[in-house]
Amino acid sequence: MARSVLAPAVLALLATPALAEGEVDLRVMSFNIWYGGVQVSQPQLIEVIRASGADIVGLQEPDGQTAAIAAAAGYPYVDLRRHIISRVPLFDPKQGERTDKGQAPYPLAGLDADAPHVWAMVAPGHVIALGNLHLSSDPYGPDLLRDGSGTDEVVAAETKVRLAEIEPYAAGMEPLVARGVPVIVTGDFNSPSHLDWTEAAKGSRPQQSVALPWPVTQRMEAAGFADAFRAAHPDLVARPGISYSPGFPWPLQVEGESMDRIDYIFAANATVRGAELWGEPGNPDVDRGFAPWPSDHRAVIADLTVTPAPAPALLAVEPRLVPEGGTFLVRGYLPGDAVWGVRIVPRGGDAASQTVTSVEGLTPTWNRAFRLSTLGLTPGPWDAVLIDETGEEQARTRFSVIGRDGKPVLSPASSSVKTGDPVTVSWTGAPGLKYDWIGVFAAGDPNVYNYLAFAYTGAVLDGTMTLTPDLYYDTLAPGDYVLRLMADDHYAVLAETPFTVTE
């Protein structure tokens, strides 16, 4: 049975043809919210998101605010590892945190290379795949052109930085695209589009004086994705779609700042029905204006039609970090209207022999959910295991119970290391946000921007990492230092612990 998901703005498109069997209409938003949405007004930011009527929103630069923004804007489902908020249920395709070893390219921080997506159940038993990313901003191609670099130099810089970042991400999505699964990727790519910088459009803006084959958007196109805004607005001159920047904040502009379309919604195996640019009032390229505009980026919105794919076995625990004495929500799905259940086991434990608590024999119902207590679950790492009616494991996801004080703990493997040696550190109770990180600071320096080395935690709640010498800006001289657990690519200190470097 065809159905439309939630968004009144989509339902109001009276000119849209009737949906074919199995098709679903979706409204999607991509929004760089500028350091958590607090630089102008977070309430105004939330109002913009509410007004969009989007079913799914990909946020960039949320700085630990994703869950709070979702709650305030009325979005019940949140993916903290991808910074996606949704009106439809979200399920991680693997275990809920990064299991790959080592540091990942920036857009894959907190994610496994073979699972950059999250499943969104847009119809009973049927899903699409979602991704959301933010590519590195420096060196910025339009700035290089402005400052005199040639096109070959710019393409070389793009290839070295952003193409290197998008390559493994696109490669991780390509198998889904090849299977015919609808895949939607939102993001701030920090790169203009090869579809915009053409010979025909050369000179249409003062800052666009050359034609240039921007490689990042070419790579997304090669992976099977369509640029939703340009598909809806092929006239480059009439609708340039400049997403950066309306101001810092609007209406303040920085003289000489390079403006371009760098925020995108890419869609594969989907039909683009329309796209909009939201931003400041009075701009003829903006479809809807708000005063004040709450970000240094404009927002991109796309109306899409998809035919979702049959869902695999799915399991989610919310929240992933559960206070001792609290409760957590478990959501599950088994294909084929199968009876299902969930068993809670210690991390990596056997569901047949190590179950601490369980709920089993559930009647199949779409998005069936139940609450469990942490009674009997000591602080530490746990797994929820999805089972069928025979008790066979079908899926598994990770969560952790944190002590009653709710505070993360950071512990070095040794309180003293020699100059040039790696530093190993463990942590428990991290929030599991995409860009949580651990930094090294000089003891006594209160400036949290002065980190001497850093590495992302992989969005792991309880884990261990080794800060190897290649991660340091300079070799640490003998002296006293501090390790700090920091939140989501920002500077809120969650935990810290001292260590000493000796000769």
Each language-model region and where it sits:
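N-terminal, active-site-proximal structural segment of metallo-dependent hydrolase catalytic domains
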Residues: R3-L6, V10, L19-A72, V127-I128, ...
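N-terminal signal peptide c-region/cleavage motif recognized by signal peptidases
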Residues: A15-P17
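Metal-dependent phosphoester-hydrolase catalytic domains
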Residues: E21, P175-P182, S191-A313
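Active-site-proximal beta-strand elements of phosphoester/diester hydrolases
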Residues: D25-Y35, V127-A156, H297
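Structured beta-strand-rich core segments of catalytic domains in phosphoester-bond hydrolases
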Residues: I56, Q60-L144, E276-G279
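Surface-exposed cleft-lining segments at the edges of enzyme active sites
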Residues: Q103-Y106, L145-L163, K202-R205
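His/acidic metal-ligating clusters that form di-metal
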Residues: A129, E158-F189
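Extended, solvent-exposed regions of the mature portions of secreted/cell-surface glycoproteins
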Residues: P312-E503
